[in-house]
């Protein structure tokens, strides 16, 4: 039975950015980054009021089709509650369409806010972390970014076909993820270009098949990445090598590709962040001052970021 939330309940969700793939872990590996959007949701007597501040304020719809609103509604439905009206304020810091998981963060933040409202009504109605991973991944189609924003740290994610009770295929896959505790010596630097990238476009550049040797190469590097991230950061250079997607996307990301080469030549493990165009660098040393100056002179924003915890509500 659906319960109605009283007017006047307020929850704020603070949700981190994320980077997916980390080189070899295409659609599998992710990491939460210390760059945060905030979503404040208040239940009201009727209607929907939404306000967007910061990134995307002039680009996203201010209405029921907004991704955060859709995620809130899905979260309320999953928790078995309903609100007669909602006031939603989105304070966006994560750059949009740059490969930093802004859409996943919007979804996770909306779901977490809805979950927080349900818990205020009855703690027994709260959704588990596994449920939040599942729900957020359904929006995205794969859980690498979404699960990183839910769980924090680095994540290994996967999916499998779901089944109904009668054995027929389910309408959605089953999504899962486990969090990894990142080695404390690892530093994260994001080099963010001014231009945007389309995930759909860059995915369209990928071939339908790959040579067996390239698949085997990425399997080895993906396994090594787990070791490098948690225990052996000295292996990050080898652990971030890839043959499945970065070279294939290079024509669409010339600045990104060039900067990955520059950083790797300097001994810094660098990859495309998600679908780009942001460059993700993983290192155990301070980022070189001269490289920062060079990047900024070319219009790149250089962000030194912590590895973040997962979404939090208050």
From Swiss-Prot:
Catalytic activity: L-homoserine + ATP = O-phospho-L-homoserine + ADP + H(+)
Residues binding ATP, per UniProt: 95-105
Coiled-coil residue spans: none
The entry's keywords: Amino-acid biosynthesis, ATP-binding, Cytoplasm, Kinase, Nucleotide-binding, Threonine biosynthesis, Transferase
Pathway listed: Amino-acid biosynthesis; L-threonine biosynthesis; L-threonine from L-aspartate: step 4/5
One Gene Ontology biological process: threonine biosynthetic process
Source species, domain of life: Bacteria
Record localization: Cytoplasm
Primary localization class, coarse: cytoplasm
GO molecular function: ATP binding; homoserine kinase activity
Record's keyword annotation contains Nucleotide-binding: yes
Record EC number: 2.7.1.39
First-tier enzyme category under EC: transferase
Matching NCBIfam families: thrB (TIGR00191)
HAMAP family, sorted: Homoser_kinase
Function recorded in the entry: Catalyzes the ATP-dependent phosphorylation of L-homoserine to L-homoserine phosphate.
Annotated family: Belongs to the GHMP kinase family. Homoserine kinase subfamily.
Protein name per the record: Homoserine kinase
Organism the protein comes from: Rhodococcus opacus (strain B4)
């Amino acid at each position: 039975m659906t319960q109605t939330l009283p007017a006047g309940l307020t929850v704020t969700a603070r949700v981190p950015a994320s980077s997916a793939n980390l080189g070899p872990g295409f659609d599998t590996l992710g990491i939460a980054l210390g760059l945060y959007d905030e979503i404040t949701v208040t239940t009201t007597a009727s209607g929907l009021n939404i306000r967007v501040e910061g990134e995307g304020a002039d680009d996203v719809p201010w209405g029921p089709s907004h991704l955060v609103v859709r995620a809130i509604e899905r979260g309320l439905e999953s928790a078995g509650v309903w609100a007669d009206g909602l006031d939603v304020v989105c304070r966006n810091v994560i750059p949009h369409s740059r490969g930093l998981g802004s859409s996943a963060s919007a979804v996770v933040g909306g779901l977490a806010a809805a979950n927080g409202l349900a818990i205020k009504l009855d703690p027994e109605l709260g959704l588990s972390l596994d449920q939040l991973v599942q729900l957020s991944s359904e929006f995205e189609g794969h859980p690498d970014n979404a699960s990183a924003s839910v769980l924090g740290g680095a994540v290994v994610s996967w999916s499998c076909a779901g089944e109904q009770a009668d054995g027929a295929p389910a309408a959605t896959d089953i999504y899962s993820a486990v969090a990894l505790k990142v080695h404390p010596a690892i530093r994260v630097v994001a080099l963010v270009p001014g231009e945007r990238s389309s995930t759909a476009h860059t995915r369209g550049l990928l071939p339908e098949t790959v040579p067996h040797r390239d698949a085997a190469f990425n399997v080895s590097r993906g396994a090594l990445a787990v070791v490098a991230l948690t225990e052996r950061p000295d292996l990050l250079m080898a652990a971030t090598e890839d043959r499945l997607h970065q070279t294939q996307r290079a024509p669409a990301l010339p600045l990104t590709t060039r900067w990955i080469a520059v950083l790797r030549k300097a001994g810094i493990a660098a990859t495309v962040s998600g679908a780009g165009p942001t460059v993700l660098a993983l290192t155990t040393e301070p980022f070189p001052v001269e490289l920062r100056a060079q990047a900024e002179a070319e219009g790149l924003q250089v962000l030194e970021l912590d590895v973040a915890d997962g979404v939090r509500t208050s």
